[in-house]
Amino acid sequence: MIKNLRGAPALSDFRVKKLLAQCEQLQLPVNDIYAEFAHFTKLNEELSTSEEKVLQQLLTYGPTIEEHQPAGLFLLVTPRPGTISPWSSKSTDIAHNCGLAKVERLERGIAYYVTLENDAQLSTSQEAQLNTLLHDRMMESIFNDFAQASTLFASSEPGELTAIDIESGGKNALVQANIELGLALAEDEVNYLFENFTKLGRNPHDIELYMFAQANSEHCRHKIFNAEWTIDGVKQEKSLFKMIRNTHEINPDYVLSAYKDNAAVMVGNKGGRFFPNPETNVYGYNHEDIQILMKVETHNHPTAISPYPGAATGSGGEIRDEGATGIGSKPKAGLVGFSVSNLRIPDFVQPWETDFGKPSRIVTAFDIMIEGPLGGAAFNNEFGRPAILGYFRTYEEEVNSFNGKEVRGYHKPIMLAGGLGNIRDEHVQKREIIVGANLIALGGPAMNIGLGGGAASSMASGQSAESLDFASVQRENPEMERRCQEVIDKCWQLGEENPIAFIHDVGAGGLSNAFPELVADGGRGGIFELRNVPNDERSMAPHEIWCNESQERYVIAVSDKNLATFEQICQRERAPYSVVGRATEEEHLTVTDSHFSDNEKLNTPIDLPLDVLLGKTPKIYKDVKTATAAGDSLDLSTVTLADAADRILSLPTVAEKTFLITIGDRSVTGMVNRDQMVGPWQVPVADCGVTASALDSYHGEAMSLGERTPVALLNFGASARLAVAESLTNIAGTDIGDLNRIKLSANWMSPAGHPGEDAGLYEAVKAIGEELCPALGLTIPVGKDSMSMKTQWEENGEQKSVTSPLSLVITAFGVVEDIRKTVTPELRTDKGDTRLVAIDLSKGKKRLGGSCLAQVYKQLGSETPDVDDAEVLKGFFNAMQTLVRAEKVIAYHDISDGGLFTTVTEMAFAGHTGVDIDISKLSNGANDDLATLFNEELGGVIQIRESDVDAIHAILAQHGILENCTDIGRLNNEDTIRFSRDGEVVLENSRTYYRTVWAQTTYRMQSLRDNPECAQQEHDVKFDTEDPGLNTELTFDINEDIVADLIIRDAVKDAENSANDITNPRVAILREQGVNSHVEMAAAFDRAGFVAIDVHMSDILSGRADLADFNGLVACGGFSYGDVLGAGEGWAKSILFNANARTMFKTFFEREDTFTLGVCNGCQMLSNLKDIIPGSEHWPHFVQNKSERFEARFSLVEIQESPSVLFKGMEGSRMPIAVSHGEGHAEFSSDAAIDAANNSGTVSMRYVNNYGDVTETYPANPNGSVDGITSLTTTDGRVTIMMPHPERVFRTVANSWHPDSWGEDSPWVRMFRNARAFIG
């Protein structure tokens, strides 16, 4: 029985306008579009009246938008029939938790009503264009009436196995299958398979060919990096991979794992890892070695086809790599990067942005940068990993490179996803897989998506059918991955009792690659049952079940002895799992299929020796010739400094990147010390990202990026050397110490096979693997390659192509001794007399080849910057380390893209100050000024105190780089950036002017992607020369610990009592599936003297936990159930409509000796429990931000007079706080309701601007809530809800900016201590 229920409007006015604009662009005759959600319920019996009411309430969620009377062309978009969407599985879980057992399944679609101009009829092609706008054809279907939606719940018989008949068709049958299935097998691999299956005496099955193709794709096996090379007739001694490994052979210090796992591991620091005791669920610090894992991946092919899911699953896959390192570890902080062709922003196309065309199967660079960053950010946000580092480059030009004149660029983009994490020392190495061990799939179900992704990504774009390209893109479900990570966390937290023996993530090739890899790496074979694979698409054929790349999955080996422990953890975390197979002694792979158990031809889809699949497959031999890049001498004779400055600041590579940053959570974990945003004006110019090792430590980790890819169009080796060097100049402002405490990841992107590029790749690898890194004492223990960076197509009968430069992206990971000493580019105006010093590591060279200056004038140049002397680079790094540790440097910024001009202006932007720069000692006259200001030779600029000059000179001299240093200027208070030479001003404009030019890219992209009203408001702020920036005003003593006596009293009592009779007040740190901010919340309450206890909603619903045992309740932030029924609403309804849970919560709220706090998702959840929270009648509903975008900001708030027990004594204080939410807009039912809330005295916190005024203006008010309302309390003050995150900034070092005078505790600790004081 299927029931249809009409839902709320699905699109805001802004989204409708955006859709209409897209229709207009496609010349579709569309006047208007109205869309609303449509819910479909499959019931196993009729609902009662009360159940019907619960279901209706469950499916009423989100913001209040005016309903329309539907009319026009009807299009119903639903998940693809035969599949179960993530929305369906989560909402169905909520329904069951609400007691709706008769609901077999919920599903959701969107009903579109399209009004056409003058009742026009759409042509077939126009219909196809409209359909493409409205749905994702890989995941969704379009129907023309509601009746057709019944097929959503239809199931069909599974597809059958297919044999490839080589017995009668010979090798040609394999050749044909290779083409039809898109396997991307080379001729020698086809021969290999033919020989082996002939020996086995049978025909191969399609599932076996798919599996072989994925496991042996370039993506998975890195054949080019393992190839043997002959260059210009000379056989080379080493493969590319051996040259990379050379760095580890020469310098293995501090490396614990390299080249053999999902990520590399280096030695970290000691600290207190904070997590709950596995037996008692009481949080506590565990002092131990905290080793650092590091990984950087790319997801280029999927991002070119479908940017949002491509980038999302790129981040998700890299996170899984980290979590599956050793026998389980913890991802901590992420990075994201993009290289694309010319952006060509509508109505903002730049003079250098020629349109060279593109094939229809890929999207534009503009589309990639609109959708891709959102996908990467959304996954990190929902998983709960801060993204604190990134890069963005655009390049597309016809240049005279190694193959003569041709178009070089990034039609096949680079989508970089990486990060660092932590792992226990005893978990770095994987354990033995014992014979008979359970081989488990943990995570989401199989779906028919991402088929052939490994093979597809190994081909140059244009070599496969468009349908196969699209089929190879995966789709994301980050909340599922979060659940899986919680399982992994609970396993590693068991220490020696960790039940995981072996773990791999499921990535390219799906289970067909992961399970064979798991058993082969463990020296075992395996026998698997195909139908034990969790499957949401019954109709799939065997090869689709085994080889699809459904995301959020891991494969794990667990012994029988540990299986019960593992299962209990999975059940508590609601993480799906299944025992799919068993490990065998014989290294053989068998997959059975019980569905066809009676059919001998179909019941054993795979029966192969593992060495046929993963053994000595054919090796690649590369015989290549070197080429010379002609280049062109730069003609800049007509270029003015002023025009060059404007163009450089408008080049997306240099321009402001706020639009890529504020969409991503940068504060979750409470351990981020340095994100991209710098200083009181939150300007995105940080050189690196820094995290604390633990919540009780000043030790930490840092990571930085380096890449100079356009240089490779002229000099392969220089480009590679510069990438390594730039990663060092970017990380030099942190307190690392020895250079060998830094380890590198190398990501290589190359158009393999393109004339000159193969020899160039060898030259570049050799340049750093054999030469520069050994000279610096650096190791590259991890990396990845993508060897198909070329796009080909036919246009009007003409063959066209865009080929990327050889692109090496280096990520440096370092161990930080003291995170408090990190120096940023913010010029300080409050440090007395200071000067700026330029450090030039090239000793006066000003080579412009491959520079941004050349690019913005559509040129390339000839001679490029380079690392001319490794000793000078080493001396620079060591000198910086000495200066940073001695706190002699006030501000630091490296010189890179855009040269000295960009470095200085960005520092001025961060410090909101003018500067006077004298280039007399750097420039050789008027004809040299351009090169002086815009060359991209290695170096940096430091701000130092006049009083420290002699001491600093001594340090610079000690490290041999004093002669590389030049005094270049001072700060001014004129809001002017001025460059002079020999007493003459050569370039001058207001800081505000340059700041707004630099901001244009962000402003334009935000205007087209987000609510344009908000984008305009944020841009307007940049014109305010008087803006004081973030500031603080406290009405209490930040250093006073108001509960010190209580904590001492509790400690004495505890010492007198037995270990199991702790008297400290207990606070329930409540989480639901998808919540991700619970650990830092527990740490904040622990700091205030509470016993913080991990409580999952599954504990409440199962009766394992009772709120009667607690003094405090905290509902934490995140994405409960992936916010499928509105932010926090599904969580709330699972309480309201579950009789036992409702009673328990209601009783707790009514107890006068308790307090409750809800933050972010917990705030949204509690706001939906108003029916059972006394005194909350004036609370609003929290809905989508006005910007219609997830907002991660560091915002200023003011504490209001209110009854809140948490804000006692803090009234009138103004201070910054972390904000990270997509649905924080306080929606009241009417103006009268707003007045009632304001008059009730229950508003406890409001957003204010930098002048201290309550504001509704974006971005000071990140969600547009009326009267700046962002926190409320009950009339008795015992229950407080708030959207910002005080728990993430309770440590001063976790604040993106703070006054120098703050100590260990930020002012937000007072809030948690107030809770402790309330309990008494």
Swiss-Prot record:
This protein's GO CC annotations: cytoplasm
Positions bound to ATP: G310, A311, A312, T313, G314, S315, G316, G317, E318, I319, R320, D321, A686, S896
Family annotation (Pfam families): AIRS_C, FGAR-AT_linker, FGAR-AT_N, FGAR-AT_PurM_N-like, GATase_5
Pathway: Purine metabolism; IMP biosynthesis via de novo pathway; 5-amino-1-(5-phospho-D-ribosyl)imidazole from N(2)-formyl-N(1)-(5-phospho-D-ribosyl)glycinamide: step 1/2
Residues annotated for Mg(2+) binding in this entry: D687, E726, N730, D894
Entry keyword Oxidoreductase: no
Subunit structure: Monomer.
Name of the protein this chain belongs to: Phosphoribosylformylglycinamidine synthase
Organism whose genome encodes this protein: Colwellia psychrerythraea (strain 34H / ATCC BAA-681)
Gene that specifies this protein: purL
